Every structure is written in C-alpha cells, then in structure tokens.
C-alpha cells in the first residue's frame, strides 16, 4: 500500500512538472476563460489524438505514431517492466523494434478517463489489453493501466509522456 501511495505522489509530481514545462504560457492560469477550450472539447480532442496513437501502434505505422508524440528529448515512456525510455527518437526506435514481433493495444474504453490539469495539459488513463511477443514466439496478453500526459501544441494535442503499469485486478470489479 505504501508503495502505491509513493508511486501516486511521484506520478502527480510528474504531471504538475509537465503542466508548467509544456504549456505554452509557462503554466500560468489564464485571466479569463476566453481561448481556453471547454472540457468537452478538450476530451473530444484528446480522445481523437489517443485514437490516432492506438491506430498507429496497431498498424505499426511510425509516421502516425510520431505525429501524435511530442518530439522532444523530454518525452518519456515508462514501460510495463519498470524501464523508462527517454527521448522521442529513442522511443520511436523502441516501438519499431517491438513491432517486429507481435504488438497490439486493445484499450478498454468503458473505463477511459480524461482530466485537465492545466489549460494546455490533460491526462488520459484507461485499462488496455496489451499483446506482445518476440518474432516467432507465441504472444501473450496482459492487462495494463495506460496513462498518457497530453499537451496542447500549435498542431493539436500531443502525448508528452506514457506510463504503463500492471493491472492484475482488471475485470474483477
């Protein structure tokens, strides 16, 4: 339990760091709501970016995936096994390697949640069934909790960070 609380605190710290470092206004709270999209608009736009990411992943299409990620050395992919890959180029190389085997993401959209943590930052969390396997080996499927930090850029919503954690109790509630 203590470990879960510690991890939750770490995750919140990262989100708050992202909200001030990735937002175009340095994290400042706007003086008025003008120019800030509504929660329903934000949710629709973030869901659309997430759908493009999933489609690109399942098609093993680097051009689609790269278009929805923030192209930065600060991009991080915290993987299921505990490793972290830092940097856009490094993450894209890791995806391309993983795609040589079995690789499929099946988001469970009935539990998808999105929250805005700043005017230009949103977090999407959803369970997924993650299937992977080395080339020539039978694939395995495990339930994971997928989390992404999305930032609003001039080109639209992009993913700045991915967090994949085990979700052994998925489907038990």
Kindly give the residue locations of the regions a language model identified.
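Short, low-complexity N-terminal intrinsically disordered segments enriched in polar/charged residues
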Residues: 22-68, 173
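Bacterial N-terminal signal peptides that target proteins for export
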Residues: 1-10
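A short, structured loop/turn motif at beta-sheet edges
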Residues: 114-122, 150-156
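A solvent-exposed, acidic/Ser-Thr-rich amphipathic alpha-helical stretch
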Residues: 44, 62-117, 141
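Short beta-strand edge/turn micro-motifs at domain boundaries
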Residues: 24-28, 143-171
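Short, cysteine-centered beta-strand-loop-beta hairpins and adjacent loop/turn segments enriched
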Residues: 102, 130-140, 168
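Bacterial N-terminal signal peptides
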Residues: 9-19
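A short hydrophobic beta-strand element
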Residues: 120-130
């Amino acid at each position: 339990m203590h470990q879960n609380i510690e991890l939750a605190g770490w995750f919140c710290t990262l989100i708050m760091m992202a909200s001030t470092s990735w937002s175009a206004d340095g994290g400042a709270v706007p003086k008025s709501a003008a120019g800030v999209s509504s929660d329903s608009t934000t949710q629709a736009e973030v869901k659309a970016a997430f759908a493009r990411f999933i489609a690109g992943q399942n098609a093993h299409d680097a051009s689609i995936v790269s278009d929805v990620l923030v192209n930065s050395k600060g991009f991080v992919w915290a993987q299921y096994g505990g490793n972290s890959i830092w940097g856009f180029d490094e993450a894209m190389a890791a995806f391309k390697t993983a795609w040589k085997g079995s690789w499929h993401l099946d988001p469970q959209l009935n539990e998808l949640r999105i929250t805005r943590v700043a005017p230009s930052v949103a977090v999407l969390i959803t369970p997924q069934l993650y299937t992977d396997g080395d080339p020539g080996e039978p694939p395995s499927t495990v339930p994971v909790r997928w989390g992404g930090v999305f930032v609003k850029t001039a080109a639209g919503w992009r993913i700045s960070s991915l967090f994949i954690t085990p979700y052994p109790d998925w489907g038990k509630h």
